[in-house]
């Protein structure tokens, strides 16, 4: 439901749209939220699935918040098909570790050690992944997928400062859009005309 507006927009632009639920979201199975660690591998598999349906497809990835970080992590996966031509990330975090560190400090005034280290141990045991492996910053350095980075300058959940190292590190062609007055995940609402003009123009360069 949250992505219905986005899916409708892309459909109106002539794209065929696939909107999968991430693990433990919507109708997808699972009881652990992966923060993009496992989900990014699912995106790779969905991309391969699209190519089985249409071997000539050109694919664009789009995500918001955790979905944005998932897109970035997928973009750095060596198994990602070359048919993925472009990606758009909106307010994604540099890594799950960085995001939880920020939240611990912002909400409780606590350092990451020992609370986050303890939480990470539980995550490894119960969910099977390390929070440090959910690392979008490392991923964008690895593969040259063109990427549009979007962030609101009033984001106090995933701080705006996270977008700058992501943008700087990205190995491929890239653009950065900072939306004035937009909170977390609210850039589309804050300035929809400018938002969609930027997204559509960027995608059209590669698809």
What are these regions (language model features)?
Residues 32-54:
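Alpha/beta-hydrolase active-site loop
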Residues 182-196:
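Catalytic histidine-centered segment of alpha/beta-hydrolase-like enzymes
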